[in-house]
């Protein structure tokens, strides 16, 4: 049910803070190269070609 994306580095990232990383992780989790990870008002990330990711996100503390 969660729609969050986790950074490949192990850092947890927020869509609101870094859409580029969010998009990169969207690709990493199986989206197409041109797919975009879309943040919504609840802080969820939507990968158009993948669906909701299941890793909870927090503020990026890298």
UniProtKB/Swiss-Prot annotation:
Molecular-function GO terms, alphabetical: sodium channel inhibitor activity; toxin activity
Free-text comment on this protein's domains from its UniProt entry: Has the structural arrangement of an alpha-helix connected to antiparallel beta-sheets by disulfide bonds (CS-alpha/beta).
InterPro entries: LCN-type_CS_alpha_beta_dom, Scorpion_toxin-like_sf, Scorpion_toxinL/defensin
Disulfide bonds: 11-62, 15-37, 22-45, 26-47
Gene source species: Mesobuthus eupeus (Lesser Asian scorpion)
Functional summary from the UniProt entry: Binds to sodium channels (Nav) and inhibits the inactivation of the activated channels, thereby blocking neuronal transmission. This toxin is active on insects.
UniProt protein name: Toxin BeI2
This protein's GO CC annotations: extracellular region
Keyword Protein biosynthesis included in the entry's annotation: no
Domain LCN-type CS-alpha/beta residue range list: 1-62
């Amino acid at each position: 049910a969660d729609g969050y994306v986790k950074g490949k580095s192990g850092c947890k990232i927020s869509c609101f803070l870094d859409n580029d990383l969010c998009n990169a992780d969207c690709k990493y989790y199986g989206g197409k190269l041109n797919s975009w990870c879309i943040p919504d008002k609840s802080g969820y990330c939507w990968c158009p070609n993948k669906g909701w990711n299941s890793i909870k996100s927090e503020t990026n503390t890298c």
